[in-house]
């Protein structure tokens, strides 16, 4: 079995006020909570989509995170996205192998070889940022209604000119972040930042006839 244990938090420097928001995931073995800190009528939100799945001897933990900043009119002023895929494998003797690289797609940069395969010759972060820029100025409702095709890719020609990756889950994470957003102190001119950190949280990864193994990864997600 594969489990994802989430610790989601956020803060903004220079402000002693604080607020909190929480979310849960229906996928077995995954849950989340989040908190942010801000000021004033602008709002900051953190949205997390996490699923854990296993098939045969391979398990996958997939997390998409979105941080948003809503202006005084309730429109998206800034968006930042990131994505993490963790794959766990097991052999026929019950020994589970955890990954050694827990970097997100944004953190991997050129080590995530999307640019070479992309018709746009653009990496993941560049395309994700183009998608984020496209959403800027929209209301949360408009962003949540972004149309995609059967493969989850955008259908709008302007968006496709800068972003050809699947965006339906990014759209949904942004919508969740908007729902979670709280007016805790952001102001005009602020930008939102997103940090994701993952680490192996499995204590015993060898299965026996009498004992199954839970491969667990701790995730910390921070919106600033």
Cite the ranges covered by each PLM segment.
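Bacterial lipoprotein signal-peptidase II cleavage site
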Residues: 11-33
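Active-site- and interface-proximal helix/loop "cap" or "latch" segments in soluble metabolic
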Residues: 38-224
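Sec-dependent N-terminal signal peptides
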Residues: 1-3
